[in-house]
Design a protein with these regions (language model features):
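Short, conserved SAM-binding/catalytic segment
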Residues: 68-75, 135-137
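Beta-strand-loop-alpha-helix segment that lines the small-molecule cofactor/substrate pocket
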Residues: 98, 103-152, 166, 384
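N-terminal Rossmann-like dinucleotide-binding module
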Residues: 10-72, 150-153, 163, 246
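Conserved SAM-binding strand-loop segment of SAM-dependent methyltransferases
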Residues: 76-80
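N-terminal Rossmann-like NAD(P) cofactor-binding module of classical short-chain dehydrogenase/reductase
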Residues: 93-94
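Contiguous beta-strand/loop segments that form the cofactor/metal-binding neighborhood of enzyme cores
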Residues: 157-158, 170, 175-323, 328-365, ...
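N-terminal secretory signal peptides and thylakoid transit peptides that target proteins
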Residues: 1-12
C-alpha cells in the first residue's frame, strides 16, 4: 500500500516529527478496556501519537486502574466498561481483555458508536466471530483494526511484492515455527497471585462473562491463559500472528481441514493448554500451512517459509528474503526486503484511518478468517479429531 506511513518510513522521517502540528480537528480521544500488561503496551503506543488523548480507562481489577494513573495521571477510571461507552466524547476504544471477553466488548463498543482497536485473537469461538461480524457490518462507518501488528511491519510491504505475480511459481506449503525457552523453574506465562487479588478488588462475575460459572479463583483470573474457558493457548497468542501475516499477504481463505496434536510436556502446573504442539491446516488454495511451536527450546525461533516451485520467501525477526529455486530460475538472485516502519505503525494506521479514512492494515475479514482457523486447531486438539470447515454453511464438522 502506498500510504503516508510507508512514505515516511522510506524517507527516514519519523512518525513523531511528521505529526507535530496536530490541529483540534485531529484530536482523537480514546478509552481502553483492559489496561493489563498488553493493554498498557498498546495504550503507550497510542499516546505516543500527537493529538491522541486518553479519556478513560476501565478494568475489573483495581490495581490496573492504579497502574494506568502512572501512564496518564488524573485520567477517569471505572471498573464497569459500560461507563466508558457512555462517554459521548470518546472516539475510539482499545480492547485488550482476555480472549473469551472480546466479543462482548467489541459488539458493545461498536453499538456505542466507537471506533475499535481489537487485540488478537479477534474472536474466541465461531459463534463469537459471527456475532462480531454482524456488529461490524451494522456499523460500516466505524473503523476496526485487529491487533495483528505484523500487518503494519515494513516487511509486510516487501512480502507482498515478493509473492506478487509468478515470482514463487506454484506455492504448495508454508512452514512456520514459533519456539521459545525460559529459565528452568520459570514456566511460560506463569504469573504470581498477589494478596490483593480477591473478590473485593476483582469483579469476578465480569471476568467470567459467558464462561461457566465457578467460585472466585485468583489463579484462574491472573493466569487465564492456562485455561480453555478463557484462552486458546499458544495458538491464540502466537500462531494467530503468523497466520494473519500470510492470510492477508496471500489472501488465504479459511482452511478446509485442520489437525492439531501436542501436549503438556514441560510444565505440570495445572495448566490445560499445551506447551508443545503441531498444527496442520489444509487450505482450499491447494496449500498446506504447518505450524510448530514449543516452549522448551528457542533454536528455531519465530520463522516462516513460503515454499513455491520458483522460489521461497523466508521471514524471521530480521526481515524477509526472496530465495530463488535455481532449478526453475537459474538467473534469479536473492532479494532482501528493506522497508521499515515505526514501532507504533499499527496503532498509527488505526489513528490515521479515523482521521483521514486511511485503509486499515489488518481489517475485520483477516481477523475473522484467522479466528476460525485458530478455533478449529484448538478444538481439533481437544477432540483428537481432524476438523473440517463447511464454507457454504459456515460450520465446523468432523
Amino acid at each position: 500500500m502506498n500510504s503516508r506511513r510507508t512514505f515516511l518510513a522510506a524517507s527516514g522521517v519519523t512518525a513523531l516529527s511528521a505529526q507535530r502540528a496536530v490541529g483540534a480537528n485531529d484530536r482523537v480521544r480514546i478509552g481502553i478496556i483492559g489496561p493489563g500488561a498488553r493493554g498498557q503496551e498498546i495504550l503507550k503506543e497510542a499516546l505516543s501519537i500527537p493529538g491522541v488523548e486518553l479519556a478513560m480507562a476501565t478494568d475489573i481489577y483495581t490495581a490496573r486502574l492504579q497502574e494506568v494513573q502512572a501512564i496518564s495521571p488524573g485520567v477517569k477510571t471505572a471498573m464497569d466498561y459500560r461507563r466508558l461507552l457512555d462517554e459521548k466524547d470518546i472516539d475510539a476504544v482499545l480492547i485488550a481483555t482476555p480472549q473469551h471477553l472480546h466479543c462482548e466488548h467489541f459488539v458493545a463498543s461498536l453499538d456505542a458508536g466507537k471506533h475499535v482497536y481489537q487485540e488478537k485473537t479477534m474472536a474466541f469461538t465461531v459463534d463469537h466471530a459471527k456475532r462480531m461480524r454482524v456488529a461490524f457490518q451494522k456499523h460500516p462507518k466505524q473503523k476496526v483494526q485487529i491487533g495483528h501488528q505484523s500487518c503494519s511491519f515494513g516487511m509486510a510491504k516487501d512480502a507482498a511484492e515478493f509473492v506478487a505475480g509468478d515470482k514463487l511459481g506454484k506455492v504448495t506449503m508454508i512452514n512456520a515455527n514459533m519456539f521459545r525457552n525460559t529459565p528452568t523453574g520459570k514456566p511460560q506465562w506463569s504469573r504470581p497471585v498477589k494478596p490483593d487479588m480477591n473478590p473485593e478488588n476483582v469483579l469476578w462475575k465480569s471476568f467470567l462473562g459467558e464462561a461457566p460459572n465457578r467460585d472466585f479463583d485468583a489463579n484462574r483470573y491472573i493466569n487465564w491463559r492456562f485455561f480453555w474457558d478463557y484462552s486458546g493457548g499458544n495458538v491464540y497468542e502466537n500462531m494467530c500472528h503468523q497466520l494473519s501475516f500470510w492470510y492477508k499477504t496471500m489472501k488465504l481463505q479459511i482452511p478446509q481441514a485442520v489437525t492439531m496434536r501436542g501436549g503438556i510436556y514441560l510444565w505440570k502446573d495445572g495448566r490445560e493448554v499445551p506447551d508443545t504442539m503441531n498444527v496442520t491446516m489444509e487450505h482450499p488454495e491447494e496449500l498446506l500451512f504447518s505450524w510448530n511451536s514449543g516452549f522448551g527450546n528457542d533454536h528455531l525461533g519465530a520463522t516462516e517459509a513460503v515454499l513455491g516451485t520458483h522460489g521461497t520467501v523466508y521471514k524471521d525477526g530480521r526481515g524477509v528474503r526472496l530465495l530463488p529455486q535455481k532449478v526453475n530460475n537459474p538467473s534469479y538472485t536473492e532479494q532482501t526486503g528493506a522497508s521499515t516502519a515505526p514501532r507504533n505503525a499499527h496503532m498509527l494506521n488505526f489513528i490515521d484511518a479515523i482521521r483521514k479514512d486511511e485503509a486499515i492494515n489488518c481489517p475485520f475479514d483477516v481477523g475473522f478468517r484467522v479466528s476460525i482457523a485458530c478455533r478449529m486447531a484448538v478444538d481439533s486438539y481437544r477432540t483428537g479429531k481432524t476438523l473440517r470447515w463447511d464454507a457454504k454453511k459456515e460450520e465446523v464438522t468432523s
